Regions:
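Weak global preference for isoleucine
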Residues: 10, 27, 34, 82, ...
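Functional cores of ribonucleases/endoribonucleases
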Residues: 74-124
């Protein structure tokens, strides 16, 4: 089997719905921390328009970025799901889910991981790692979304 195929998969609709429901619950509970990767090594060679920093500042200019991300992540649906990917750099962490949404007539690529672990060693807090929240370099196609009608 192709290594790339092992790293990417399409989860069943029920699994994706469960993930989205848990994501919303974690955000609404108020106990989740958002870890937003604003500056990424890959961004050094990328057009600034396609970086996390630019996209969030452009879409939510007068908002606290963490609060804006919490709101936007809580609005994700099964229809926004694209795929699930394994993070080779951190193989013991949970898989990352990739979603896509349209904002101001531009596609936004969203890649997140929810870790239900204690990162502060005190309160049992969970965290959501937002690796990507940036304008898509390549426009999405309908077939990118397995659960859109």
């Amino acid at each position: 089997m192709n290594k790339e195929l092992k790293l990417r998969k399409i989860e069943g609709k029920f699994e994706v719905q469960t993930y989205v429901d848990r994501l919303k619950y974690a955000i609404e509970s108020g106990s989740v921390k958002i870890n937003f990767q604003k500056k990424r090594k890959v961004d050094e060679a990328r057009d600034g328009k396609y970086t996390n920093r630019y996209t969030v500042a452009h879409l939510f200019p007068n908002e606290d970025e963490v609060e804006a991300l919490k709101r936007e992540l809580s609005l994700l649906t099964v229809a926004d799901y694209i795929e699930t990917v394994k993070d080779l750099r951190f193989p013991n962490y949970s898989e990352m889910r990739v979603f896509g949404k349209e904002y101001v007539n531009q596609d936004v690529y969203i890649k997140i991981r929810v870790e239900l672990v204690n990162i502060t060693h005190v309160a049992g807090d969970s965290f959501i790692f937002v690796m990507s929240f940036h304008f898509a370099e390549i426009p999405f196609k309908e077939e990118d979304f397995p659960y859109r009608k």
